[in-house]
């Protein structure tokens, strides 16, 4: 006979960070006797939910998708931006086999390496650091002809801010003693995603045929002329950069083309124009026989080209591992965060695992959640208490949306009410667990509600924060909490409490030290 499950409940308080400052801190201002009692009597600490600790760039605030992915995966899940940045820092980028293969083929035949990408510090579709590294890699591997075809931003950056980026790349090439910027064009053309193929055609013909509406003898002169025509970065028309005595650059047979955008959606159309044998969206004057066309990441599985950083499938995430061990689990949230405790917590998988059940509680239909700061938390709690009392599940994962969704409204009084409602809900869960001898871990995915005003502007602060998040053990065991934890350590902690061995794929470390 199997033992009756005494559930381990993971309570994720969305947007519930920790700030030492009491100013405009809805958690500090709220009446929260249950929370205060837990912090006074139960082992607790703080863990990181932002920046490189969750696979985001340094200093980047966390978000719900990334937070739940890390919580469920039991390892830091690096986003594409940080995977590439980390590879450059570690030096691995410069030996990337997919890029190296294309570059080396071109070098062996004394052909050119063409670098395409959004030249921008924006960090949304690309980062100029990555383009600099690519130019350095091509030079290191012996390329004599290195050409950058720069797409200008102005959407994820100010509308007229491209000049420092162009100057930086000019300086990079000068330092290498080879290579140059060959063309500039706005992202409006090169990075269309709405099947406006006439725009993509302008970019393709500029890069492949050197066909341009305008020419200039330097990248900065090209930009200045565009500004004089009334164009901002995003809308700069096709311009070939042709220094005195040179010709417009073309893509020739045997050249290598490396597309350095890491975000897929706006890189697909131009990539298809380069590599699809039966491409028919616009007539190509010429389709060069390339030594290689490389996508930095997989823009689409259907595009016939290799990628330098293929998707990393997440295996043995918490849900999958529990299912393999015959454990039952319940995922529960209201509509606003239901995808987070299911799809994202399961590492990007839609289907439930064997032994997994799900409960979706509808979110209230109000214009903004400051009008109903309790949201559907009481109804969510009703179902959790019922599930605990039934003792049917080994693990229950619940998300409470209030801290984040009410925090986003910027209404301080509503945020305080949201925290007070959460406190009542936690009290009910703790009481139910007490009766059956269950345990809970309380944490958050990122901060928000602990900072409701931006002190520098005096305006409401509606965004997430980089603050650490609480980690509280609720139960009868004697244990201590180690410092320096991150969200990726939560799943290994749950396995420790359940007496299950941690799978090799989970590289996080348990936060609890059992006495």
From Swiss-Prot:
Binding site for Mn(2+) 1: 404, 408, 464
Keywords, ordered alphabetically: Glycolysis, Isomerase, Manganese, Metal-binding
Alphabetical list of Pfam families matching this protein: iPGM_N, Metalloenzyme
Pathway given in the UniProt record: Carbohydrate degradation; glycolysis; pyruvate from D-glyceraldehyde 3-phosphate: step 3/5
Any one GO cellular component localisation term in the record: cytosol
Listed cofactors: Mn(2+)
Residue positions binding substrate: 125, 155-156, 187, 193, 263-266, 337
Binding positions (Mn(2+) 2): 14, 64, 445-446
The protein, known as: 2,3-bisphosphoglycerate-independent phosphoglycerate mutase
């Amino acid at each position: 006979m199997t033992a009756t499950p005494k559930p381990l409940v993971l309570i994720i308080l969305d947007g519930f960070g920790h700030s030492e400052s009491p100013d405009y801190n809805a958690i500090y201002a709220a009446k929260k006797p249950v929370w205060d009692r837990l912090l006074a009597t139960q082992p607790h600490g703080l863990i990181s939910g932002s920046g490189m600790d969750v696979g985001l760039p340094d200093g980047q605030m966390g978000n719900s998708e990334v937070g739940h992915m890390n919580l469920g995966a039991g390892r830091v899940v690096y986003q594409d931006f940080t995977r590439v940045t980390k590879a450059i820092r570690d030096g691995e980028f410069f030996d990337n086999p997919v890029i190296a293969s294309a570059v080396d083929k071109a070098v062996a035949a004394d052909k050119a390496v063409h670098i395409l990408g959004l030249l921008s510090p924006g960090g949304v579709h690309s980062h100029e650091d990555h383009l600099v590294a690519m130019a350095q890699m091509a030079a290191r591997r012996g390329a004599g002809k290195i050409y950058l075809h720069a797409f200008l931003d102005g959407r994820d950056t100010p509308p007229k801010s491209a000049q420092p980026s162009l100057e930086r790349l000019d300086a990079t090439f000068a330092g290498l003693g080879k290579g140059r910027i060959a063309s500039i064009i706005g992202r409006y053309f090169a990075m269309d995603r709405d099947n406006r193929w006439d725009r993509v055609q302008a970019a393709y013909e500029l890069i492949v045929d050197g066909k341009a509406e305008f020419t200039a003898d330097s990248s900065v002169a090209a930009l200045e002329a565009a500004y004089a025509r009334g164009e901002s970065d995003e809308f700069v028309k096709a311009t070939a950069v042709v220094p005195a005595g040179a010709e417009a650059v073309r893509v020739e047979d045997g050249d290598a083309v490396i597309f350095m955008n890491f975000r897929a959606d706006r890189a697909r159309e131009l990539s298809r124009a380069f590599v699809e044998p039966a491409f028919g969206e616009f007539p190509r004057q010429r389709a060069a026989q390339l030594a290689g066309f490389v996508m930095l990441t997989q823009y689409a599985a259907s595009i016939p080209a290799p990628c330098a950083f293929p998707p990393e499938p997440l295996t043995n995430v918490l849900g999958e591992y529990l299912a393999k061990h015959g454990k039952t689990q319940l995922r529960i949230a209201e509509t606003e965060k239901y995808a987070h405790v299911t799809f994202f917590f399961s590492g990007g998988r839609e289907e439930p695992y064997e032994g997994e059940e799900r409960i979706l509680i509808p979110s209230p239909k109000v214009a903004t959640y400051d009008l109903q700061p309790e949201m559907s938390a009481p109804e969510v709690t009703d179902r959790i208490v019922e599930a605990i009392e039934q003792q049917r599940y080994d693990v229950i994962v619940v998300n409470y949306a209030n801290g984040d969704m009410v925090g986003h409204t910027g209404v301080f009084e509503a945020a305080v009410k949201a925290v007070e409602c959460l406190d009542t809900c936690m009290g009910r869960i703790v009481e139910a667990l007490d009766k059956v001898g269950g345990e809970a871990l309380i944490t958050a995915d990122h901060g928000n509600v602990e900072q409701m005003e931006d002190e520098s502007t005096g305006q409401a602060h509606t965004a997430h924060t980089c603050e650490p998040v609480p980690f509280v053990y609720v139960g009868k065991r004697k244990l201590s909490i180690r410092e320096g934890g991150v969200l990726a350590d939560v799943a290994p902690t749950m396995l420790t409490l359940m007496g299950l061995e941690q799978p090799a794929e989970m590289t996080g470390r348990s936060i609890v030290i059992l006495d």
